[in-house]
Amino acid sequence: MKRLNLIILSVFNLFFGCKTNTDLSSEEIIYAENNYEFDRTIKLNIYSDSTYIFTSSEKDPRYEKIEKFKGFCFKRLDTIYFKPFEFELTDSEKAVIKNNFIEFIDGKYPLRIKIKKTNFPLKEEAYSEKQDSYSTFTFNSKFYDCFKEDVKPYDLSEKEINELEILLIKCIEENKSKMTRPITEYQKQVIAVKNLQGEIEVWVNCNCKEKNDEFQYSILDYNDGGDCHFNLKINLSKNTYSELYINGEA
């Protein structure tokens, strides 16, 4: 029976183009981790034998909760496929490696996990010099309603990130009566698209800097805080901004 199980596993790996070591040992090829407030952590380990382990842990002075999910996956170029079963936490069939994150793109809710270590080189981020204050998210109408019309997700270049920053500075300068902080005090979350006219539009969510990296994991939403939190739309093709919303305004 043991031999039969090994044969079945080998056939499964061959079918999905996965690499299995002859001695059945496995090498970690990707390690990703998010650290949240209140001692909450999620980790994803992906191995060369086409297996993965996802771990979610929460700690409290009174208890500790740890959950583990195991399954199979394989990597092709910059895409990770979860077969024959979806990634259980989000019911995703695939994820993409983008801007040093594993980004689950087809699940029941958006999830990004920051890559900490790989055994292969990653593409350099377009905004590598500003990665401590910028985080880009891929538009999906299922998750985000900042764009209503038929648009396509768009990846900003380093040049476009710099142009975006100039327009953010301009916005603050032109609204001094409501905005008192320089742009350097904000962490920026951006969603970029190309509209039907071929113009590059960007929704920008700005929040006062925090010590943690949570702004890189998901879009943050605050109900108060005044000009510590604001968002707007920027049209890079026209060099204009619109729909400025500052927390605390009616």
Q: PLM features: what roles do these ranges have?
A:
Residues 56-58, 84-87, 206-210, 234-238, ...:
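A mature extracytoplasmic/lumenal domain signature
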Residues 172-229, 233:
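Functional cores of ribonucleases/endoribonucleases
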Residues 4-14:
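Sec-dependent N-terminal signal peptides
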Residues 44-45, 71-74, 92-97, 187-195:
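Short, exposed beta-strand/loop patches in secreted or surface proteins that constitute
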Residues 18-68, 81-122:
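Lipid interaction determinants
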Residues 72-79, 194-200, 234-240:
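A short, structured loop/turn motif at beta-sheet edges
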Residues 125-193:
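N-terminal secretory signal peptides
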Residues 103-120, 225-250:
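C-terminal partner/receptor-binding element of secreted or periplasmic proteins
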